[in-house]
């Protein structure tokens, strides 16, 4: 499910996606599978279109609160993104700001920069086997939903073997 107003865009993406300001995220992902005991993450990319929105809030439903953490992804300076002799498979060749820092976020006081892609990073851990539908919503300061999206996670009743690294 995806519901949004015309001036706000939001959808789920892979945890591997680098959600960068002016680049539309490409790794759309609305469902995945994990094992019992595995830590799993996904992102919700969002942007406000044409207006700076402040004092936004979020709501996350679909899993026990003690098993889910929400972070905001913040950009940090990247002064040396490519070493000499590197291949051509790079996100940026010049110094820039890159999304990298995960900051714990309170459910309110969130800002959406006009035209800039940003992301929430959602981590689930310790979920029992079963099917989960995470419903993530962004709310305006009056508590009205301005965008909403779902992410389905299937937790298998098997456990990964211990790694000997």
Predicted segment positions?
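Short solvent-exposed strand-capping/beta-turn motif centered on an Asx-Ser/Thr pair
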Residues: 47-52, 63, 127, 141-143
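Surface-exposed binding patches on compact interaction domains or structured appendages
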Residues: 1-26, 50-118
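Short, hydrophobic beta-strand segments
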Residues: 118-127
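An acidic-aromatic substrate-binding cleft motif
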Residues: 145-165
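Contiguous beta-strand segments within globular domains
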Residues: 27-53
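Short glycine/proline/serine/threonine-rich loop/turn segments at secondary-structure transition edges
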Residues: 113, 126-134
